[in-house]
Amino acid sequence: RIDKKNSIILGLVYGLGHKTQGYANYYDQQRQNKVYVGDTLSLRNGFELPHTFGVGLTWNYNNRLRVAADYTLQKWSKVQYPTLSRSTSGYTYTAETGLFSDLSKYSLGAEYVVNPDGYRWYNRIRYRLGAVYTTPYTKVNGSDGPRNYQVSAGVGIPIINSHSNRCVLNLAAGFEHVAPQIRGSLKENY
């Protein structure tokens, strides 16, 4: 708490990356003279989930205005993923790193309420805005995948009944733009 009307909250988060303890199987089926011939290559512990780091900061003014910013980093560039490679002795199926990029996510949001303790219901409506920018972790033909942009707006309408005055009906609308890095790819809007 900074003073009577202002407070700041700092948050940190960590997600432990780990192997999934499963098998990755590659099935190769070919047709030779009307007969299907198959081969299977297996790899134990071929998949991993990334370490995740996050930091967030929220400023609260008099319980009427909240502004928050978050940053999240997922270390996808360090995870192992099964890859089929051709060598002089045939095919090999191994877990390799560097097939993905690190994902960064930047978020910003705000909420405003005229009077959170007001007698009139319309004074307790919560107005919200938010924006998110995300870099991709996927790669397409060696290039970074599509970047993601999102914006949203919403309201929280208080519902008052004889049992509780804490119920809120949340309504929101959002827009998302997916922008590929490869020229000629389709851009998507939701």
Protein language model features and the residues they cover:
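Outer-membrane beta-barrel porins/channels
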Residues: 1-190
